[in-house]
Amino acid sequence: MTQEHNAAVLDLNPTFSTLIFFVNGKKVIDTNPDPECTLLTYLREKLRLCGTKLGCGEGGCGACTVMISRIDTLTNRIKHIAVNACLTPVCAMHGSAVTTVEGIGSTRTRLHPVQERLAKAHGSQCGFCTPGIVMSMYALLRNLSQPSMKDLEIAFQGNLCRCTGYRPILEGYKTFTKEFGCAMGDKCCKVNGNKCGEGMENGGDMVDDKLFEKSEFVPFDPSQEPIFPPELQLNKDWDSQTLVYKGERATWYRPGNLEDLLKIKAQFPEAKLVVGNTEIGVEVKFKHFLYPVLVNPTKVKEMIDVQELEDSIYFGASVSLMDIDRILRSSIEKLPEHQTRFFQCAVNMLHYFAGKQIRNVASLGGNIMTGSPISDMNPVLMAGAVKFKVAKYVEGQIKYREVCMASGFFTGYRKNVIEPTEILVGLYFPKTLEHQYVVAFKQAKRRDDDIAIVNAAINVFIDPRSITVDKVYMAFGGMAPTTVLATRTADIMVKQQWNKVLMERVVENLCAELPLAPSAPGGMIAYRRSLVVSLFFKAYLTITQQLIKSGILPQDSLPQEELSGSDVFHTPALKSAQLFEKVSNKQSECDPIGRPKIHASALKQATGEAIYCDDMPRMENELYLALVLSTKAHAKILSIDASEALAMPGVHAFFSSKDITQHENEVGPVFHDEEVFASDMVYCQGQVIGAIAADNPNFSSKTARKVTIEYEDIKPVIITIEQAIEHKSYFPDYPRFTEIGDVEKAFSEADHVYEGSCRMGGQEHFYLETHASLAVPRDSDEIEIFCSTQHPSEVQKLVAHVLSTSAHRVVCRAKRLGGGFGGKESRAIAVALPVALACHRLRRPIRCMLDRDEDMMITGTRHPFLFKYKIAFTSEGRLTGCYIECYNNAGWSMDLSFSVLERAMFHFENCYKIPNIKVGGWVCKTNLPSNTAFRGFGGPQGMFAGEHIIRDVARILGKDYLEIMKQNFYKEGDITHYQQKLDNFPIEKCFYDCLQQSNYYQKRKEIEEFNRNHRWRKRGISLVPTKYGIAFGVSHLNQAGALINIYADGSVLLSHGGVEIGQGLHTKMIQCCARALQIPIEFIHISETATDKVPNTSPTAASSGSDLNGMAVLDACEKLNKRLAPIKEANPNGSWTEWINKAYFERVSLSATGFYRMPDIGYDPVQNPNALMYNYFTNGVGSSIVEIDCLTGDHQVLSTDIVMDIGSSLNPAIDIGQIEGAFMQGYGLFTLEEMIYSPQGVLYSRGPGMYKLPGFADIPGEFNVTILTGAANPRAVYSSKAVGEPPLFIGCSVFFAIKEAITSARLMNGLSEDFKLESPATSARIRMACQDEFTNLIEQPPAGSYVPWNIVP
């Protein structure tokens, strides 16, 4: 890392310095490849193949997945693997064939079945993840033409999707599998004797179950796939060539033999061996390491060799993890079971090691030498006492030695006994003995593709006659700077009988041998310590059951209810059903309303042809902007020195607050309390201080780090809500209160009064496309902004403000967004404004797309909330009064926090009538990035408190919480605490339908029986309703415009004020327009959202996109229809094109604007008390069943049933996709997704490595969605209802089901059912809430006696 790059290139065997590979069948020759360049950068920047996306840059999201094909040296066969292009060095591609999403199919030619089925099964919403998912499936099919569902599960371990909820992707790709059948599974309509696809009766309404027609799919013929380039297949020199690529800062070597490899290492001891680049790539990108010498050993025979020996299998250190897995599985099938226990243990651990794209290229040697303390494989290797073959080049010859993976192997954090000039050549996986037992376990936040919190491997030799321990190795990761062996505890086990007494003794000794300091990196101290003993106990149970099975121990050696403690979760095959109202047979075939039409851009998204902001072609004189960010959370800026950066060639300018006036620098979505560039003070880490304009993105980011900033720290640094309360750090004019009735009287007259509290954390938006902007200078001092924003008009307005110009000289365009979820509503300005300023000053196009870590540092999250409440209720359970205090963590500026708080205050009662309410709200000012809009906008946080209240009442009264719900449900015509009458409010219908469809009461009985029979596994079931108000909180935003241009050929160009962010808004608007004009949807096109087409647009937010823009589209259509009416009347049998042609020649205007303002909106308790707060409410109910592992805190969602009232659906496929996607996002909010900050305000969770979204394996095993029928809504376009945000809170059903399961565990342990469980219900919180004899061994340090590693905001 510190080695200079001026060393001479070694004189090796004949070398080759030209990079040759194939991309989509075309030969690429590069005579000067850059060793620091990734394949992704090469594809996008040099070859302009932009279908492959940059989502995270660390191999954690799969958006960059491509397929690599090459001749496998081990088998001499063509091998196809999916890889992460963001980590793959382009220099490693020599002699390979790369296939990108563009290379398998196109809308211009023909779609590949992989692309077609994903699109037509509605598996693409925003589309940014789609190319990566397509390529993961394509690579699987190139290896297995008919895979199993298990193969699909493994193939998608490394892919994330933030929009769909994964179900439609799996449904589409299930059609390729052996298990393919009816998508309805057990709920297939044929079970009831109905003919599939003809609809079913449901309460008098005809319902449909078919979102796509499988029979229309193009058959998959694997024989028609492109051939491997013959040039690569016929020329045998590709693998034997010694390659040397010398770049500006680094040299890449690919030696052809071990001697040359060792010579390089002898000459350059600090040289890095690169196999998969999965560790080094992350270090280079995010830690900014520079490695001048990179060596690729994948063509050295000894490093890739595999040999089966008498007592072991030898693996070269460069053999990929997937190859190791395949070979071990083959050996497990062939060899006696007792010989393969170590192999089985390794295979089990490899399944959860990263994603498949990583395992396809990562090597075990790299994992060992990296020496991560949370490596998944190192504990297995250490417990197995695996031997390594090590070599170095000394005095003209190769010298070998053997090293054992023992307690002394690691000498410190990421250090080991292998010398700098030595190389780990290979390792020996031992075959096990008959009475040797090896098991391993891993606990992470998410099962698939996640780093371990703690992992363990136990290798024990047991004398079958005395049933005593002969020898034992116990290795643990996550408990020290290195993987460690618990040698002291192992010593006391020798010669002891394997029984419960020994287990208890071991557990106590492990607690003593493996302590953790209260401030240890990684946090979760008590949880990690408990995992050590829990994982050993699971190993004890597993090995004991093996001893019972082999007859060494009697059958009654373990109580029956204890057996489940050894189990691990496995992903079940998905079962699902989607039920929606069937379109009437009387409806015209060309009328698309109510039909499951595919997303308008789905086919382009599946082929990589859909263009996102950063996919736009580079302009000749374009510059790239990199932001300079604050490294302090609260400090005064003493000086900014950009001289070193400006002196570097290729740097054109540095911008800071000195380059604009104070007035121009003051910005914000409502209150101008932010700055484009921090001037005198910084209030959070990640605040923008300046920007560097340079020739290319990699260079600009490097030079931005050369800007030196001196600070003076300011105290206090306020991070948490509790700290804000302690320091009374609130925004002005807060708290605010609203009330109805007489709360004090309710408390004085109540049978019961209870005080409680609940808390929930924030949530990162994690749209797959990060914030991006491109600004282009135009004539007459105009500027054009292409921006990934949900609010083009706000970007237009604030750009005009910063440039001191008028809005009519600024055009903001948004073609499509790779996700938004509210995070691109107001925060787009953090990128757009510096880009616009640089463009304006330099008069050159300027581009900026944030890296994932930058985006997460800068843009804010969902608001964390704290609620304190006091409730009054009768002995029967009827709520009579509530006083509640709502605190949200706003971050350093107001942004939209006041509106988020208001919605939480107006949603906390959820679906329940409370006659007397007083609610207060506090906007807490902290030293975090400004938190912002996020799908739900405070509603889910408020309803979270309401559901706690219901369950508190039920617990106190000893009643079923469902009975408390029934007693308190709002009725039709009831008045809320903000004076709104509830009309068309079918919450009870949803409630009872959900109870019936989920078979709730029967399932609960089964769960009770399960819990009685299982000590360490518990299940819970919970149901939650939701009531979500539809409208912007400020009345002026409840408006929309549209523009329709009909051209003389009859084609229609539709423009409206909404932005396509994946939610299908453009698709629905096309459907609305098609019905209104009575034309097929093929006539209509939407190009983009632009401020020069529709002015003064509202943000695409508040779930109001369809409601507002749809009505504006109808208004424009009505105007056109009136103009066309005489022409149609004169020629009633004419066609659309004939009518339009006639209108053109008669000089009838074929262009119309539409406008809509939502009526009756604008509630204000003082100024306008009779107005509505919301236009209407979208309702729904969901029920989920969860199983938890009480020993680890892991959980699995077994089933979810959702019934949603969304009026008359405009498009059932898109609406069900929104319901499922929102549910999964809500599930993540309440269980997996945790923002991790240091006490100093440093965000630790800055990418998918530390921040965990739900993955494919996290969806409910059975996932059923029903759209309520017969519930037309008179207050929105074509009787529909908004759907984007309302279903999200139903994800909370999982949280409360987890809490029910924990309660069962606690009751079995004799503990109170009254306990706190904060959201998200992470594995750590679940485990520590269960409380048992193992957690009781963990001593907690006194509060305030230490500074924790992380805190909860």
From Swiss-Prot:
InterPro entries membership: 2Fe-2S-bd, 2Fe-2S-bd_dom_sf, 2Fe-2S_ferredoxin-like_sf, 2Fe-2S_ferredoxin-type, 2Fe2S_fd_BS, Ald_Oxase/Xan_DH_a/b, Ald_Oxase/Xan_DH_a/b_sf, Ald_Oxase/xanthine_DH-like
Gene Ontology CC entries for this record: peroxisome
Gene assigned in the entry: XDH
Domain FAD-binding PCMH-type: start-end pairs: 245-434
Keyword Protease applies: no
Gene Ontology molecular functions: 2 iron, 2 sulfur cluster binding; FAD binding; flavin adenine dinucleotide binding; iron ion binding; molybdopterin cofactor binding; xanthine dehydrogenase activity
Subcellular location field: Peroxisome
Subunit: Homodimer.
Family, similarity comment: Belongs to the xanthine dehydrogenase family.
Pfam families to which the protein is assigned, alphabetical: Ald_Xan_dh_C, CO_deh_flav_C, FAD_binding_5, Fer2, Fer2_2, MoCoBD_1, MoCoBD_2
E.C. code: 1.17.1.4
Chain positions recorded as [2Fe-2S] cluster 1 binding sites: C56, C61, C64, C86
Catalytic activity from the UniProt record: xanthine + NAD(+) + H2O = urate + NADH + H(+); hypoxanthine + NAD(+) + H2O = xanthine + NADH + H(+)
Identification of the protein by name: Xanthine dehydrogenase
Amino acids binding [2Fe-2S] cluster 2: C126, C129, C161, C163
Co-factor requirement: FAD; Mo-molybdopterin; [2Fe-2S] cluster
